[in-house]
């Protein structure tokens, strides 16, 4: 069985960071709110931590869409602020995730991604995202304005549509293929996939 990792981040513009040394992130559960009176209590009043039945609906969907299939995923707890489930309670974000054993590929904009499997195996795309989530990936010889937007994400099914079920596959990382989620920003394509033997029906 794949061990489950847990990351907990107290509220207040802190960075919630998930990462996998081997494989890619697969989010299992996510809580934004408060379910106990032990987590993130330093310097807080009893009133701020007494409500232990507070959770934001849909937090797990946000984490899955932003983090599944990536090696590293960072987001601010502030993204949940507009839909605060309990305004008087001091909250935290807690995510449980596994590191799913997949092949992880990054392709800079205008380059071509090559997905391939051993003979007899076919590609099964786990996740794909075209955009920019940090300042460092695909940043060589780029001016700062082209890599400044880190919150540019465009999960896409186009890689799965083009490549799933094939032994090998090429797809260009370009706005023509995926559209442009953030104009003027130099983007990259992240793909996580596994190779498997075709299921015999």
From Swiss-Prot:
Glycans are attached at residue 168. It comes from Scomberomorus niphonius. It holds the Pfam family SUEL_Lectin. Keywords: Disulfide bond, Glycoprotein, Hemagglutinin, Lectin, Repeat. This is L-rhamnose-binding lectin SML. InterPro entries: Lectin_gal-bd_dom, Lectin_gal-bd_sf. Disulfide bonds join 10-40, 20-99, 54-86, 67-73, 108-138, 117-195, 152-182, 163-169. Transmembrane segments: none annotated.
